[in-house]
Amino acid sequence: MLPAQNKLTSSVQFRTTMRKGRRAGSSTVVVHLWDSAESLDGTGEKGEVASFGGPRFGLIVSKAVGNAVIRHRTSRRLRHVCARIAADSPELLTPTHHVVIRALAGSGQASSQDLERDIRHGLRKAGRVRTDK
């Protein structure tokens, strides 16, 4: 289960992460990564943002993934993977990072290991995560 402090909770957080963040995709997921400490005025300087308990994750699982049973199973798998990545937080992501994971049609048939591999690969491609994992 993904703890509450690791969840994106508002549509504004989702929208900002999707629009301002870097995107990387694979055959099963698209990963959007945004550092909420980045300034929103475009100057490139880091802002002073207090964030507790991050990094924060959000999921988008559409009907393209499958019927309700498959979508819920996929969501549970993605939440479990996000919890594992959040546990690795000190070496992977800072508390100010927001991650939105959009499940693609192929994610309904993918195993948890495949999903975790693709998410970690997406985070690396987005330019934040070190490649030693």
UniProtKB/Swiss-Prot annotation:
Gene Ontology CC terms, in alphabetical order: ribonuclease P complex
Pfam families membership: Ribonuclease_P (PF00825)
The entry's keywords: Endonuclease, Hydrolase, Nuclease, RNA-binding, tRNA processing
Enzyme class label: hydrolase
One BP annotation, GO: tRNA 5'-leader removal
Gene Ontology molecular-function annotations: 3'-tRNA processing endoribonuclease activity; ribonuclease P activity; tRNA binding
InterPro entries linked to this entry: Ribosomal_Su5_D2-typ_SF (IPR020568), Ribsml_uS5_D2-typ_fold_subgr (IPR014721), RNase_P (IPR000100)
Lineage: superkingdom: Bacteria
Record-listed E.C. numbers: 3.1.26.5
Catalytic reaction annotation: Endonucleolytic cleavage of RNA, removing 5'-extranucleotides from tRNA precursor
Family: Belongs to the RnpA family.
Subunit composition and interactions: Consists of a catalytic RNA component (M1 or rnpB) and a protein subunit.
Entry function: RNaseP catalyzes the removal of the 5'-leader sequence from pre-tRNA to produce the mature 5'-terminus. It can also cleave other RNA substrates such as 4.5S RNA. The protein component plays an auxiliary but essential role in vivo by binding to the 5'-leader sequence and broadening the substrate specificity of the ribozyme.
Protein name in UniProt: Ribonuclease P protein component
Originating organism: Corynebacterium efficiens (strain DSM 44549 / YS-314 / AJ 12310 / JCM 11189 / NBRC 100395)
